[in-house]
Amino acid sequence: QDAATALSGSGPAYFYFLVEAMTDAGILLGLPRAQAHELIVQAAIGAAVMLRDSGEHPVKLREAVTSPAGTTISAIRELENHGVRAALIAALEAARDRSRELATGNG
């Protein structure tokens, strides 16, 4: 229950946070806010539909759009170097722990 709360109950907020950050990055790179937002929303919709409909593991889908020495692998390397994967795991663990606290009346 607590794990499900951490993953899906709070999941939309994590997604919105990532969209917000990617929109800000697009603005930093010179795109107008509306265009940056629309590009990331469309990319997210496409990725979600592909993930749902393909039945493929996310790693396989990511690898399919990652060219050797290309832009995507450069970005993925930066995400890994900055600990984004570990931060997401730690965030979900914190949400799970907080869910447990709230369930026991320690909130």
Each model region followed by its residue ranges:
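Short, surface-exposed linear patches
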Residues: 28-30, 88-89
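Active-site-proximal catalytic alpha-helix in oxidoreductases
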Residues: 1-27, 38-52, 70
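Hydrophobic alpha-helical context, especially transmembrane and signal-peptide helices
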Residues: 2-4, 34, 82, 86
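Conserved Rossmann-fold dehydrogenase catalytic segment
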Residues: 1-13, 32, 57-58, 76, ...
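NAD(P)-dependent Rossmann-like dehydrogenase/reductase catalytic/cofactor-binding core
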Residues: 41-107
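All-alpha amphipathic helical-bundle segments outside canonical DNA-binding/catalytic cores
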Residues: 32-38
